[in-house]
């Protein structure tokens, strides 16, 4: 049993060694990669598309800019940003998981998104980019899977250009109590069953439900972003706080 709190972290409801978590999360996403898009639609009843659209609308991305879609998975945001930045801009789709990165690359190439998109396997805690590289960074439903969130936020801050913005789209804490109870029931009882039926992997979706519950609430994440150096941090509750979009700037 690991009992040194400085060397442990959460994997869902489990307490594990920090050195173990990345491999455990990797196993989850290797397992779910092939069914990731289908499961997103089923789990959220398609509403994830609206959450991502709102994120894009809040990004302020313009033609010619450089964007990092971190933990970008199958590339939903990258596809939109690619059109927004145009031929003179650049989008980097980065993910720590090579299975997810492969799915994203294949999906985007199949729909004709080529030319201004690069693919990088990267750990959010140690981004392999120079200081002041990106006009905008988004991380969509990825931060809760990171072992050291504070370190990752500092890494994102470092590679943002002055005037750049970071947007974190993530599951959060419902602000309506009856909804919170219903959401818990759905997450812990229905979601794993859907995962078992569709992806033949109920355990991975049980972890995903648990990881949502262990993720910091809206105000805690706001404070974490401020501690990383971001300014003018604000958040927007979506679907009554089931999801929140946090936005902060580097000045």
UniProtKB/Swiss-Prot annotation:
Keywords: Menaquinone biosynthesis, Methyltransferase, S-adenosyl-L-methionine, Transferase, Ubiquinone biosynthesis. The keyword Nucleus does not apply. S-adenosyl-L-methionine binds at residues 74, 95, 123-124, 140. Disulfide bonds: none annotated. Gene3D superfamilies: Vaccinia Virus protein VP39. PROSITE patterns: SAM_MT_UBIE (PS51608), UBIE_1 (PS01183), UBIE_2 (PS01184). It comes from the Bacteria. The keyword S-adenosyl-L-methionine applies. It catalyses: a 2-demethylmenaquinol + S-adenosyl-L-methionine = a menaquinol + S-adenosyl-L-homocysteine + H(+); a 2-methoxy-6-(all-trans-polyprenyl)benzene-1,4-diol + S-adenosyl-L-methionine = a 5-methoxy-2-methyl-3-(all-trans-polyprenyl)benzene-1,4-diol + S-adenosyl-L-homocysteine + H(+). InterPro entries: SAM-dependent_MTases_sf, UbiE/COQ5_MeTrFase, UbiE/COQ5_MeTrFase_CS. Pathway: Quinol/quinone metabolism; menaquinone biosynthesis; menaquinol from 1,4-dihydroxy-2-naphthoate: step 2/2; Cofactor biosynthesis; ubiquinone biosynthesis. One of its GO terms (molecular function) is demethylmenaquinone methyltransferase activity. GO terms for biological process: aerobic respiration; menaquinone biosynthetic process; methylation. SUPFAM superfamilies: S-adenosyl-L-methionine-dependent methyltransferases. Its EC number is 2.1.1.163, 2.1.1.201. Belongs to the class I-like SAM-binding methyltransferase superfamily. MenG/UbiE family. Methyltransferase required for the conversion of demethylmenaquinol (DMKH2) to menaquinol (MKH2) and the conversion of 2-polyprenyl-6-methoxy-1,4-benzoquinol (DDMQH2) to 2-polyprenyl-3-methyl-6-methoxy-1,4-benzoquinol (DMQH2). This is Ubiquinone/menaquinone biosynthesis C-methyltransferase UbiE. It comes from Enterobacter sp. (strain 638).
């Amino acid at each position: 049993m690991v009992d040194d709190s400085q060397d442990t972290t959460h994997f869902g409801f489990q307490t594990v060694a920090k050195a173990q978590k990345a491999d455990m999360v990797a196993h989850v996403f290797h397992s779910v990669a092939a069914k990731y898009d289908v499961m997103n639609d089923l789990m959220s009843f398609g509403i994830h598309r609206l959450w991502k659209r709102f994120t894009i609308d809040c990004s302020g991305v313009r033609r010619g800019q450089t964007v990092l879609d971190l933990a970008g998975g199958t590339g939903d945001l990258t596809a939109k940003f690619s059109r927004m930045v145009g031929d003179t801009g650049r989008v980097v789709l980065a993910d720590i998981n090579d299975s997810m990165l492969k799915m994203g690359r294949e999906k985007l190439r199949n729909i004709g998104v080529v030319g201004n998109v690069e693919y990088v396997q990267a750990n959010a805690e140690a981004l392999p980019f120079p200081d002041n590289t990106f006009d905008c960074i988004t991380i969509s439903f990825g931060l809760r899977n990171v072992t050291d969130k504070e370190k990752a936020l500092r890494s994102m801050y470092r590679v943002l250009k002055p005037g750049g913005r970071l947007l974190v789209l993530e599951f959060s804490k419902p602000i309506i109590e009856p909804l919170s109870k219903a959401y818990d029931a759905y997450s812990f009882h229905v979601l794993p069953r859907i995962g078992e039926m569709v992806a033949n992997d109920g355990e991975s979706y049980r972890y995903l439900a648990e990881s949502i519950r262990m993720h910091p609430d809206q105000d805690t994440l706001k404070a974490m972003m401020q501690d990383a150096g971001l300014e003018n941090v604000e958040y927007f509750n979506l679907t009554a706080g089931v999801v929140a979009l946090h936005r902060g700037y580097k000045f």
